[in-house]
Amino acid sequence: MSRLGALGGARAGLGLLLGTAAGLGFLCLLYSQRWKRTQRHGRSQSLPNSLDYTQTSDPGRHVMLLRAVPGGAGDASVLPSLPREGQEKVLDRLDFVLTSLVALRREVEELRSSLRGLAGEIVGEVRCHMEENQRVARRRRFPFVRERSDSTGSSSVYFTASSGATFTDAESEGGYTTANAESDNERDSDKESEDGEDEVSCETVKMGRKDSLDLEEEAASGASSALEAGGSSGLEDVLPLLQQADELHRGDEQGKREGFQLLLNNKLVYGSRQDFLWRLARAYSDMCELTEEVSEKKSYALDGKEEAEAALEKGDESADCHLWYAVLCGQLAEHESIQRRIQSGFSFKEHVDKAIALQPENPMAHFLLGRWCYQVSHLSWLEKKTATALLESPLSATVEDALQSFLKAEELQPGFSKAGRVYISKCYRELGKNSEARWWMKLALELPDVTKEDLAIQKDLEELEVILRD
């Protein structure tokens, strides 16, 4: 039972419980008056038989005959004898009341356990956030110079996620360390001994960066004169590089890796250009999709988001900057705590809207907006209220909103995404339009799997085939 169902059932059950209690109280009052009167007349021995069981015409069914005890006229007026059919109706209602009370008790227990679990989760999130703030404060209070360790075999600083048998929110928020974290623990073991288990270095992160940074050091002397002369090179110098990066981005997995390495090698020369920075952020997003290691995925998403932020600092009028910043927010949110995931969701929507406002003919922006609306429309009532309480902003979207965005992306570029067509089919099915859903399902089957999202949504497509089968 979902939390929303638990809340609704609890409210309905509470009303039923109050009505039942009032009825039982009235019956108890009548029973008490009858008992007192029989005591006065010296007929207390007949009271246990005032309500008795008797066999009905239905085999196997017993009903309780509500017959009046012989007495004065007042007794007969208080509890008149009921016909057998009336007694059966009363018993059926009492059975229904008892069943409802049992169901209500079960729902209350489930609601209590779910609320207890939610409270514990929120407390854990707050505690982890406070502990992380304390760690950052301690590190800022005791700055020191890092000593490089020969065991790492690299001069670059890599951010990795903590590894272990369990992966908690505390680790996802603050379990970062560098490849040389061992030397940090040796210098500050007394102050940060409790963080030692969380800071496990990852020795297999982004091996390609080592060579790229070595090349940067070799090219530093040649690029310094250009930087001192006036910053970045002109457009005629960087344009071939940008075109090559765009071509590699549209290629296969190997092409994306080469494009990332190409941009990383030229960051020292062209890193002050906005059109270079958002392409570098896009390359980080590609690498985040390609890698399978969780720590590497988080590191790529984090570094890419920083590059996108640097690009936005140079101007707010680039649709590509907003678009790839939103994409990296979504990728990084997969490795963050609940509160930060909610914040990333709002940032995602904000920057996608800006990208659409600046470049309304971009099909990717409309596809991302449709996916956001679809996910929000399927949040539970409790999840929406939690998000609204955390950020003091309403969170609402419908399946119809998602459908319009997906259709807009398909209109701008037919066959833009296989996943987009699957989402269109799912939206039509949820809106009760099965014929349209079948049509878009067939169109989705015509497209090849291009992205990992296309592969991941293949299961949904197979389920649609079964549901929409003629």
From Swiss-Prot:
Q: Where in the cell is it found?
A: Mitochondrion outer membrane; Cytoplasm; Nucleus; Cytoplasm, Cytoskeleton, Spindle
Q: What does this protein do?
A: Involved in cellular calcium homeostasis regulation. May participate in differentiation and apoptosis of keratinocytes. Overexpression induces apoptosis.
A family per Pfam: RMD1-3
Subunit comment for this entry?
Interacts with PTPN2. Interacts with microtubules. Interacts with VAPB. Interacts (via FFAT motif) with MOSPD2 (via MSP domain). Interacts (via phosphorylated FFAT motif) with MOSPD2, VAPA and VAPB.
Organism, scientific name: Homo sapiens
Q: What are the boundaries of the region Disordered? A: 168-231
Q: Where is this motif: FFAT?
A: 157-163
Q: What is known of its domains?
A: The transmembrane region is required for mitochondrial localization. The FFAT motif is required for interaction with MOSPD2. The FFAT motif is involved in the interaction with VAPA and VAPB and its phosphorylation regulates these interactions.
Q: Which residues form a coiled coil?
A: 92-124
In terms of PANTHER family, this protein maps to: REGULATOR OF MICROTUBULE DYNAMICS PROTEIN, REGULATOR OF MICROTUBULE DYNAMICS PROTEIN 3
Which SUPFAM superfamilies would you find in this protein's record? TPR-like
Tell me which domain of life the UniProt entry assigns to the organism this sequence originates from: Eukaryota
Tissue pattern of expression reads: Present at high level in epidermis and seminiferous epithelium: while basal cells in the epidermis and spermatogonia show no perceptible amount, keratinocytes of suprabasal layers and differentiating first-order spermatocytes up to spermatids exhibit high expression. In skeletal muscle, its presence is restricted to fibers of the fast twitch type. In surface epithelia containing ciliated cells, it is associated with the microtubular structures responsible for ciliary movement.
Q: What is the lineage of its organism?
A: Eukaryota, Metazoa, Chordata, Craniata, Vertebrata
User: Known post-translational modifications?
Assistant: Phosphorylation at Thr-160 of the FFAT motif activates interaction with MOSPD2, VAPA and VAPB.
State which ranges are Cytoplasmic (membrane side): 36-470
- The answer to keyword Transport applying to this record is no
Keyword field contains Disulfide bond: no
Q: What is this protein called?
A: Regulator of microtubule dynamics protein 3
A GO cellular component annotation in the UniProt record: postsynapse
* Family per record: Belongs to the RMDN family.
List every position bearing Phosphoserine.
Answer: S44, S46, S50, S57, S183, S193, S212, S232
Compositionally skewed regions (Low complexity) per UniProt: 220-231
Listed A to Z, the keywords are: Apoptosis, Coiled coil, Cytoplasm, Cytoskeleton, Differentiation, Membrane, Microtubule, Mitochondrion, Mitochondrion outer membrane, Nucleus, Phosphoprotein, Transmembrane, Transmembrane helix
Q: Record's InterPro entries?
A: RMD1-3_a_helical_rpt, TPR-like_helical_dom_sf
